Amino acid sequence: MRVCFYTLGCKVNLNETGALEQMFRSAGFTIVPEGEEADVFVVNSCTVTNFGDQKSRKWLRRAKRENPGAVTVLTGCYPQAFPEEAAQFMEADLVCGNGDRKAILDNVLKLLDGHERIVAIAPHAKGERFEELPVERFETHTRAFIKVEDGCNRQCAYCVIPRARGPVRSRA
């Protein structure tokens, strides 16, 4: 099976995509670059700007149009921050937020087995734990990104990060 990842946004997203690539590789998937045929397409979205949301939807629409039998996944900050809107995006077979990244592979395997569309966006909770996502290597970067903290406790009126990433939690 072949899987293609498309990552928008920050280095945290790059780190999390690296962890997802490792999980899929360990399950026997081959990681392919954008533009190649794949059985699964995963977009790790950014929602800091509306442009990121649009780009995520556009990329998944194209993936579904060019590979109608493929499983498409919308994950990351966009569905986490705007779950109702993301859940309505029918081009995504799996819609999930920033929590429980380890469940993505299991849900993709269910979809490949014929399971109906899955929307799994859990809201962030107070006391939520830091999710350890080990990354052994980065395919497309010469430097590794190490995630030491996630979230934000400030509630700036103009910023979506606390909504997308939840409360601050760290490795320590």
What residue spans do the PLM features occupy?
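Proteins enriched for Cys/Gly/acidic motifs involved in redox and nucleic-acid/cofactor modification
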Residues: 1-172
